[in-house]
């Protein structure tokens, strides 16, 4: 039903120097439809998830990440 959690060591990277321009890292937290993955799948803590969500939304507004992927 759900794909396996990412559970990578990206939590430390989120705390330090993650930026809305780091699209390659932020794309790990977005599914194939362009939706932001929930905490139960990413394995991030609450503050980290809020920061990632905020950065993804900033990247979408800056046109670095798409709002919707593959809508036909």
From Swiss-Prot:
- InterPro entries the record matches: Ribosomal_bS18 (IPR001648), Ribosomal_bS18_CS (IPR018275), Ribosomal_bS18_sf (IPR036870)
Q: Does the keyword RNA-binding apply?
A: yes
What protein family is recorded? Belongs to the bacterial ribosomal protein bS18 family.
Keywords of this entry? Chloroplast, Plastid, Ribonucleoprotein, Ribosomal protein, RNA-binding, rRNA-binding
Query: Could you cite one Gene Ontology molecular function of this protein?
Result: small ribosomal subunit rRNA binding
SUPFAM superfamilies, alphabetically? Ribosomal protein S18
Which Gene Ontology CC terms are recorded? chloroplast; mitochondrial small ribosomal subunit
| Organism this protein belongs to | Emiliania huxleyi (Coccolithophore)
- Signal peptide positions are none
Just give the chief location class.
plastid
- Source organism superkingdom: Eukaryota
Q: Quote the subunit structure annotation.
A: Part of the 30S ribosomal subunit.
Any GO BP annotation: translation
| Cellular compartments annotated | Plastid, Chloroplast
Q: What is this protein called?
A: Small ribosomal subunit protein bS18c
> What PROSITE patterns would the database entry show?
RIBOSOMAL_S18
């Amino acid at each position: 039903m759900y794909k396996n959690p990412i559970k990578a060591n990206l939590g430390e990277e989120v705390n330090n120097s993650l930026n809305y321009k780091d699209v390659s890292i932020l794309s790990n937290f977005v599914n194939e439809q362009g939706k932001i993955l929930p905490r139960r799948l990413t394995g991030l803590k609450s503050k980290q998830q809020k920061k990632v969500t905020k950065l993804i939304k900033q990247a979408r507004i800056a046109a670095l990440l798409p709002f919707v992927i593959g809508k036909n």
